[in-house]
Amino acid sequence: MLPCFQLLRIGGGRGGDLYTFHPPAGAGCTYRLGHRADLCDVALRPQQEPGLISGIHAELHAEPRGDDWRVSLEDHSSQGTLVNNVRLPRGHRLELSDGDLLTFGPEGPPGTSPSEFYFMFQQVRVKPQDFAAITIPRSRGEARVGAGFRPMLPSQGAPQRPLSTLSPAPKATLILNSIGSLSKLRPQPLTFSPSWGGPKSLPVPAPPGEVGTTPSAPPQRNRRKSVHRVLAELDDESEPPENPPPVLMERRKKLRVDKAPLTPTGNRRGRPRKYPVSAPVAPPAVGGGEPCAAPCCCLPQEETVAWVQCDGCDVWFHVACVGCSIQAAREADFRCPGCRAGIQT
């Protein structure tokens, strides 16, 4: 980490300029600010009133102090330089502190626009590759090639980007978002560290017809015993339903025995808990299918016909034919007369 000091521009039309200074080790130096780019390290070129900034407007004097720098500001302008809104006498040096506000140009009367060049002074410690710093100052009265702004590049082999491909968003934008303690921020290497993000997989939008529909497994049903409701015929019975309910058709429908989840099979996996469920199904075909197993079927004509399955032989009966109630079938085991006779013998 290198001790540096910065000028962060927070006023004017452009804003966002950040100048980082790192004097040569072991020696003091002077940096100049003004509109003469050939003589100054920081060129201040006003867009509104060019006459308000002198050729060499002010100087920053840096002297080593321990492992840090003592920086003072000296005014050389005809229009004035302000530190914390107090005008600095011409030719007078003032030591700067972290967080001081510097204004280059006259202080306008109340109600007028402020100076274009309004900076905050900061003392920071940064890595060389984090900032492009002004190192060697220009000699007085000379315009040497290579003097002034000289970027501090990372060590050999470290990843870097050319200065011509810098991001349009200046680094100072990150600092402006947290004015409270600018010098205490830990700078992020944005200038020379490439941040190529790999292709991100975006979620594939679902077709319009599938929005809001999620497949779900049919509810678990008891294969041993159930109660059905047979609805009366509808006028539009000829139109098949779009999504038939996944429930057991009546056992008289032999064509769908293999697909009905509640049709009894030869291989039983133990006695499950009895849980009769009522579900609407299509009406039975007249004269077809398996009838009720009761010896004397009363052929119920109600709109809703309830069925119950024997817990012994898995045969289905009309609830009305066996003389029990739906509530009793839910709460206790049901045995048909044949199974009860077999138990007694």
UniProtKB/Swiss-Prot annotation:
InterPro entries: FHA_dom, SMAD_FHA_dom_sf, TCF19, TCF19_PHD, Zinc_finger_PHD-type_CS, Znf_FYVE_PHD, Znf_PHD, Znf_PHD-finger. Residues 147-167, 190-227 are annotated as: Disordered. A zinc finger (PHD-type) spans 293-342. Zn(2+) 2 binds at C310, C313, C336, C339. One of its GO terms (molecular function) is zinc ion binding. Zn(2+) 1 binds at C296, C298, H318, C321. It is found in: Nucleus. The modification Phosphoserine is found at S78. Coiled coil: none annotated. It comes from the Eukaryota. Transmembrane segments: none annotated. One of its GO terms (cellular component) is nucleus. CDD domains: FHA_TCF19 (cd22685), PHD_TCF19 (cd15609). Residues 31-88 form the FHA domain. GO terms for biological process: regulation of gene expression. PANTHER family: TRANSCRIPTION FACTOR 19. Potential transcription factor that may play a role in the regulation of genes involved in cell cycle G1/S transition. May bind to regulatory elements of genes, including the promoter of the transcription factor FOXO1. This is Transcription factor 19. It comes from Pan troglodytes (Chimpanzee).
